[in-house]
Amino acid sequence: FDFETDGSDPTTCSPVQLSSVIVDPYKLEIVKDSEFNIYLKPEKLEKAKGVTIDNHPYTDSDILEWHGKVKGVDKSEILNSWLEYPDAKLSWKQFMDYLESYHLFRSGGKKTKFSAPIASGYNIISFDMKIVDRLAKKYGGYDKKEKGNSIFHPRDKIDIMNLVYIWFRFIPEIKSISLDNVRGYLGVDATNAHDAVKDVKDCADILIRFLKLHKNFASKVQFKDSFR
């Protein structure tokens, strides 16, 4: 999953787009028709009045210009689209319902917190998961006992950036493991990059490639008693 946001600080920014796909952990492929995409009105605009391109809550940053450059439109179009987005609470409920429908049950199993989807994405531990916990606490899906969200698997997370770091750490020509650089190195088309729909599809494809690689190696490496 991936957020597009109105800022770079995960402790304060608001999401404006949230996209996701589901990867089948056994077939190692994107589940058919699992694509999900919603937009969310940012908190700064929820109660703002008289907002215009010359009078808005983002005058202290270039975030509107940045999103405009990514989408190839004027910043005023970005602002106007954000104003039209549905309330974050409603969009968040849709995402919760979406994840509920993808719990993984083993034979005879019951729905528990451990059957919930495993969160995965690029740099999610440092960024996206912090936003998830904030939204869960504000709108629903928060576990007070665990002090975190209850919509994803409580223990397991797969941050693709960490996988990339481990595999690419000793390749000198790779100077950065940003998603854009990794896309370029792997030969992934960057058209529409930084749109959440595009980013989650690319991340899912990269994750699947690494999972298949791990599966292939795991069957060939002698782990048992290897420290004896």
Annotate the PLM regions:
Residues D9-T12, M129-R134, I206-L207:
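A short acidic (Asp/Glu
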Residues E77-L83, Y142-K147, V188-A193, F217:
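Short, polar/flexible loop-turn hinges at active-site or ligand-entry regions and domain interfaces
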Residues I171-R183:
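A structural motif
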Residues I158-E173:
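Short alpha-helix plus adjacent loop in nuclease-associated cores
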Residues R183-Y185, H194-R228:
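Acidic two-metal-ion nuclease catalytic site recognized across multiple nuclease folds
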Residues F1-Y122, H194:
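Conserved non-catalytic scaffold segment of RNase H-like nuclease domains
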Residues I124-F127, L163:
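Short, solvent-exposed loop/turn segments at secondary-structure junctions
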Residues F127-R155:
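Substrate-recognition/cap helix-loop segment adjacent to the acidic, metal-dependent catalytic center
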